[in-house]
From Swiss-Prot:
PTMs per UniProt: Methylated by PrmB.
Protein name per its UniProtKB record: Large ribosomal subunit protein uL3
NCBIfam families: L3_bact
Highest classification ranks of the organism: Bacteria, Pseudomonadati, Pseudomonadota, Alphaproteobacteria, Rhodobacterales
Coiled coil residues, start to end: none
Protein backbone atom coordinates (compact mmCIF):
# COMPACT_ATOMS: atom_id res chain seq x y z
CA UNK A 1 0.00 0.00 0.00
CA UNK A 2 1.58 3.23 -1.17
CA UNK A 3 0.32 6.58 0.01
CA UNK A 4 1.78 10.05 -0.15
CA UNK A 5 4.52 11.26 2.16
CA UNK A 6 5.04 14.84 3.29
CA UNK A 7 7.59 17.63 2.87
CA UNK A 8 8.66 19.16 6.18
CA UNK A 9 11.10 21.75 7.47
CA UNK A 10 13.51 20.78 10.23
CA UNK A 11 12.91 23.24 13.08
CA UNK A 12 15.43 21.75 15.52
CA UNK A 13 15.73 19.29 18.39
CA UNK A 14 14.22 19.31 21.88
CA UNK A 15 13.00 16.79 24.43
CA UNK A 16 9.57 15.65 25.55
CA UNK A 17 8.66 14.36 28.98
CA UNK A 18 6.36 11.36 29.12
CA UNK A 19 3.80 10.59 31.81
CA UNK A 20 6.17 8.10 33.46
CA UNK A 21 8.85 10.78 33.79
CA UNK A 22 11.05 9.58 30.94
CA UNK A 23 12.45 12.17 28.56
CA UNK A 24 12.73 11.49 24.85
CA UNK A 25 14.95 13.48 22.46
CA UNK A 26 12.90 14.50 19.44
CA UNK A 27 13.35 16.39 16.20
CA UNK A 28 10.59 18.88 15.43
CA UNK A 29 9.42 18.88 11.81
CA UNK A 30 6.99 21.53 10.54
CA UNK A 31 4.51 21.28 7.66
CA UNK A 32 4.31 24.71 6.01
CA UNK A 33 1.26 25.03 3.73
CA UNK A 34 1.80 21.57 2.26
CA UNK A 35 -0.44 21.34 -0.82
CA UNK A 36 -0.85 19.06 -3.82
CA UNK A 37 0.56 20.81 -6.88
CA UNK A 38 0.04 18.16 -9.57
CA UNK A 39 -0.95 14.55 -10.22
CA UNK A 40 0.85 11.87 -12.20
CA UNK A 41 -1.42 9.18 -13.65
CA UNK A 42 -0.69 5.91 -15.40
CA UNK A 43 -2.71 6.94 -18.46
CA UNK A 44 -0.83 10.19 -19.00
CA UNK A 45 2.57 9.75 -17.37
CA UNK A 46 3.01 5.99 -17.04
CA UNK A 47 3.05 5.98 -13.24
CA UNK A 48 0.93 7.15 -10.31
CA UNK A 49 2.25 9.88 -8.06
CA UNK A 50 1.38 13.17 -6.41
CA UNK A 51 3.54 16.27 -6.54
CA UNK A 52 3.55 18.28 -3.33
CA UNK A 53 4.73 21.81 -2.65
CA UNK A 54 5.66 23.34 0.70
CA UNK A 55 6.66 26.76 1.97
CA UNK A 56 6.13 30.10 0.26
CA UNK A 57 8.39 31.55 -2.43
CA UNK A 58 8.41 35.04 -3.90
CA UNK A 59 6.99 35.22 -7.40
CA UNK A 60 10.03 37.13 -8.68
CA UNK A 61 12.26 34.34 -7.34
CA UNK A 62 10.25 31.70 -9.22
CA UNK A 63 10.88 30.85 -12.85
CA UNK A 64 8.20 31.63 -15.39
CA UNK A 65 7.62 27.95 -16.08
CA UNK A 66 7.07 27.19 -12.38
CA UNK A 67 4.83 30.24 -12.00
CA UNK A 68 2.63 28.84 -14.75
CA UNK A 69 2.76 25.41 -13.10
CA UNK A 70 1.57 26.80 -9.77
CA UNK A 71 -1.03 29.01 -11.45
CA UNK A 72 -2.53 25.98 -13.19
CA UNK A 73 -2.88 24.31 -9.78
CA UNK A 74 -4.33 27.54 -8.29
CA UNK A 75 -1.79 27.54 -5.45
CA UNK A 76 0.81 30.07 -4.34
CA UNK A 77 4.42 29.59 -5.51
CA UNK A 78 6.11 26.98 -3.34
CA UNK A 79 9.62 26.92 -1.93
CA UNK A 80 10.09 23.15 -2.15
CA UNK A 81 8.53 20.63 -4.56
CA UNK A 82 8.75 16.84 -4.40
CA UNK A 83 6.96 13.82 -5.86
CA UNK A 84 5.71 10.76 -4.00
CA UNK A 85 4.72 7.50 -5.69
CA UNK A 86 1.24 6.36 -4.65
CA UNK A 87 -1.28 3.71 -5.60
CA UNK A 88 -3.88 4.89 -8.13
CA UNK A 89 -6.63 4.76 -5.51
CA UNK A 90 -4.59 7.02 -3.19
CA UNK A 91 -4.28 9.97 -5.56
CA UNK A 92 -5.12 13.33 -3.95
CA UNK A 93 -6.91 16.22 -5.61
CA UNK A 94 -4.85 19.19 -6.75
CA UNK A 95 -4.94 22.05 -4.25
CA UNK A 96 -5.68 19.86 -1.22
CA UNK A 97 -3.66 20.62 1.93
CA UNK A 98 -2.18 17.83 4.06
CA UNK A 99 -2.05 18.19 7.86
CA UNK A 100 0.24 16.76 10.53
CA UNK A 101 -2.39 14.15 11.42
CA UNK A 102 -1.15 12.26 8.36
CA UNK A 103 0.98 10.34 10.88
CA UNK A 104 0.01 9.15 14.34
CA UNK A 105 1.85 8.61 17.60
CA UNK A 106 3.87 5.42 17.61
CA UNK A 107 4.11 5.09 13.83
CA UNK A 108 7.50 4.45 12.21
CA UNK A 109 8.65 6.68 9.36
CA UNK A 110 11.64 7.13 7.06
CA UNK A 111 13.09 10.64 6.89
CA UNK A 112 15.34 11.70 3.99
CA UNK A 113 17.33 14.91 3.72
CA UNK A 114 20.67 16.44 2.77
CA UNK A 115 23.27 15.87 5.48
CA UNK A 116 25.40 18.68 6.88
CA UNK A 117 28.49 19.26 4.72
CA UNK A 118 31.87 18.69 6.41
CA UNK A 119 34.12 19.63 3.51
CA UNK A 120 37.29 17.65 2.71
CA UNK A 121 37.73 15.21 5.60
CA UNK A 122 40.45 12.73 6.44
CA UNK A 123 40.00 8.98 6.77
CA UNK A 124 39.81 9.10 10.57
CA UNK A 125 36.90 11.55 10.53
CA UNK A 126 35.22 10.27 7.39
CA UNK A 127 35.53 6.48 7.91
CA UNK A 128 36.46 6.18 11.59
CA UNK A 129 39.95 4.84 10.84
CA UNK A 130 42.32 4.35 13.76
CA UNK A 131 45.26 6.15 12.19
CA UNK A 132 48.93 5.18 12.40
CA UNK A 133 51.10 4.91 15.51
CA UNK A 134 52.30 7.97 17.39
CA UNK A 135 55.96 6.90 17.28
CA UNK A 136 58.13 3.89 16.29
CA UNK A 137 59.15 5.31 12.97
CA UNK A 138 55.92 7.12 12.07
CA UNK A 139 56.34 10.79 11.29
CA UNK A 140 53.89 13.24 9.70
CA UNK A 141 51.50 10.42 8.70
CA UNK A 142 49.89 9.86 12.10
CA UNK A 143 46.35 10.51 10.80
CA UNK A 144 46.77 9.08 7.31
CA UNK A 145 44.85 6.04 6.04
CA UNK A 146 47.93 3.99 5.18
CA UNK A 147 48.19 1.68 2.19
CA UNK A 148 45.58 1.95 -0.55
CA UNK A 149 46.12 -1.37 -2.33
CA UNK A 150 48.46 -4.21 -3.26
CA UNK A 151 51.49 -4.43 -5.58
CA UNK A 152 51.92 -4.62 -9.37
CA UNK A 153 49.05 -7.11 -9.37
CA UNK A 154 46.38 -5.70 -9.61
CA UNK A 155 48.35 -2.47 -9.93
CA UNK A 156 45.43 -0.19 -9.19
CA UNK A 157 43.25 1.16 -6.40
CA UNK A 158 39.85 -0.51 -6.35
CA UNK A 159 36.74 1.61 -6.69
CA UNK A 160 35.06 2.34 -3.40
CA UNK A 161 38.30 2.29 -1.39
CA UNK A 162 37.79 4.24 1.82
CA UNK A 163 40.01 7.28 1.56
CA UNK A 164 40.03 10.94 2.47
CA UNK A 165 37.58 13.07 0.50
CA UNK A 166 34.49 15.24 0.56
CA UNK A 167 32.23 14.39 3.49
CA UNK A 168 28.56 15.23 3.97
CA UNK A 169 26.23 17.31 1.79
CA UNK A 170 24.75 14.06 0.45
CA UNK A 171 21.26 12.60 0.32
CA UNK A 172 20.76 10.50 3.47
CA UNK A 173 17.74 8.49 4.63
CA UNK A 174 17.26 7.61 8.30
CA UNK A 175 14.87 4.68 8.63
CA UNK A 176 12.45 3.54 11.32
CA UNK A 177 12.15 6.77 13.29
CA UNK A 178 9.17 6.70 15.65
CA UNK A 179 6.61 9.49 15.76
CA UNK A 180 6.31 10.63 19.38
CA UNK A 181 3.72 13.40 19.04
CA UNK A 182 1.86 15.47 16.45
CA UNK A 183 0.26 18.91 16.60
CA UNK A 184 -2.13 19.52 13.71
CA UNK A 185 -2.94 23.10 14.76
CA UNK A 186 0.71 24.16 14.47
CA UNK A 187 1.59 21.61 11.78
CA UNK A 188 4.27 19.86 13.86
CA UNK A 189 5.52 16.28 13.72
CA UNK A 190 7.94 15.20 16.47
CA UNK A 191 10.04 12.11 15.76
CA UNK A 192 12.35 10.30 18.13
CA UNK A 193 16.05 10.89 17.47
CA UNK A 194 17.91 12.91 14.86
CA UNK A 195 17.18 13.42 11.17
CA UNK A 196 19.62 14.41 8.41
CA UNK A 197 20.30 18.06 7.69
CA UNK A 198 20.65 21.33 9.53
CA UNK A 199 18.05 23.62 11.08
CA UNK A 200 15.84 25.13 8.43
CA UNK A 201 16.55 22.33 5.96
CA UNK A 202 13.87 20.50 4.01
CA UNK A 203 13.24 16.77 4.49
CA UNK A 204 10.76 14.23 3.15
CA UNK A 205 8.86 11.91 5.46
CA UNK A 206 7.37 8.59 4.30
CA UNK A 207 5.84 5.50 5.88
CA UNK A 208 8.61 3.11 6.95
CA UNK A 209 9.30 0.57 4.20
CA UNK A 210 10.73 -2.00 6.63
CA UNK A 211 7.67 -2.00 8.89
CA UNK A 212 4.16 -3.32 8.16
CA UNK A 213 1.79 -0.73 6.76
CA UNK A 214 -0.25 0.62 9.71
CA UNK A 215 -3.88 -0.42 9.73
CA UNK A 216 -5.14 2.88 11.15
CA UNK A 217 -3.32 5.04 8.61
CA UNK A 218 -5.51 7.68 6.97
CA UNK A 219 -6.09 7.06 3.27
CA UNK A 220 -5.41 8.70 0.94
CA UNK A 221 -4.10 11.36 3.36
CA UNK A 222 -5.05 13.54 6.31
CA UNK A 223 -6.58 16.48 4.46
CA UNK A 224 -7.42 19.86 5.93
CA UNK A 225 -10.67 19.99 3.97
CA UNK A 226 -11.81 16.67 5.48
CA UNK A 227 -10.92 17.91 8.96
CA UNK A 228 -12.89 21.11 8.38
CA UNK A 229 -15.89 19.13 7.12
CA UNK A 230 -15.70 16.85 10.15
CA UNK A 231 -15.48 19.88 12.43
CA UNK A 232 -18.50 21.46 10.75
CA UNK A 233 -20.42 18.20 11.04
CA UNK A 234 -19.50 17.97 14.72
CA UNK A 235 -20.61 21.57 15.29
CA UNK A 236 -23.88 20.89 13.46
CA UNK A 237 -24.44 17.74 15.51
CA UNK A 238 -23.67 19.63 18.73
CA UNK A 239 -26.05 22.42 17.70
CA UNK A 240 -28.77 19.88 16.88
CA UNK A 241 -28.23 18.13 20.20
CA UNK A 242 -28.39 21.47 22.02
CA UNK A 243 -31.59 22.36 20.16
CA UNK A 244 -33.11 18.98 21.05
CA UNK A 245 -32.11 19.42 24.68
CA UNK A 246 -33.57 22.93 24.72
CA UNK A 247 -36.81 21.68 23.14
CA UNK A 248 -37.00 18.84 25.66
CA UNK A 249 -36.39 21.28 28.51
CA UNK A 250 -39.09 23.59 27.15
CA UNK A 251 -41.53 20.68 26.83
CA UNK A 252 -40.75 19.55 30.37
CA UNK A 253 -41.26 23.10 31.63
CA UNK A 254 -44.57 23.33 29.77
CA UNK A 255 -45.70 20.01 31.25
CA UNK A 256 -44.71 21.16 34.72
CA UNK A 257 -46.56 24.44 34.23
CA UNK A 258 -49.65 22.58 33.03
CA UNK A 259 -49.47 20.24 36.02
CA UNK A 260 -49.17 23.19 38.40
CA UNK A 261 -52.14 24.93 36.76
CA UNK A 262 -54.19 21.73 36.97
CA UNK A 263 -53.27 21.34 40.64
CA UNK A 264 -54.22 24.95 41.34
CA UNK A 265 -57.55 24.49 39.51
CA UNK A 266 -58.29 21.31 41.48
CA UNK A 267 -57.43 23.06 44.75
CA UNK A 268 -59.66 26.01 43.84
CA UNK A 269 -62.51 23.62 42.98
CA UNK A 270 -62.08 21.84 46.30
CA UNK A 271 -62.19 25.15 48.16
CA UNK A 272 -65.35 26.15 46.28
CA UNK A 273 -67.08 22.86 47.14
CA UNK A 274 -66.07 23.19 50.77
CA UNK A 275 -67.40 26.74 50.92
CA UNK A 276 -70.71 25.62 49.35
CA UNK A 277 -71.08 22.76 51.84
CA UNK A 278 -70.32 25.11 54.70
CA UNK A 279 -72.92 27.58 53.45
CA UNK A 280 -75.57 24.84 53.12
CA UNK A 281 -74.82 23.58 56.61
CA UNK A 282 -75.11 27.09 57.97
CA UNK A 283 -78.47 27.59 56.26
CA UNK A 284 -79.70 24.24 57.65
CA UNK A 285 -78.72 25.20 61.17
CA UNK A 286 -80.53 28.49 60.77
Amino acid sequence: MLRSGVIAKKVGMTRLFMEDGKQIPVTVLQLDKLQVVAQRTSEKDGYSAVQLGAGTAKAKRTSQAMRGHFAAAKVEPKRKVAEFRVDPENLIGVGEEITANHYFEGQFVDVAGTSIGKGFAGAMKRHNFGGLRASHGVSISHRSHGSTGQCQDPGKVFKGKKMAGHMGAARVTTQNLQVVRTDANRGLIMVKGAVPGSKGGWVTVKDAVKKPFPENAILPAALKSAAEEAEKAAEAAAAAAAAEAEAAAAAAAAEEQAAMEAAEAAEAKTDTVAEAEAAEKKEGDA
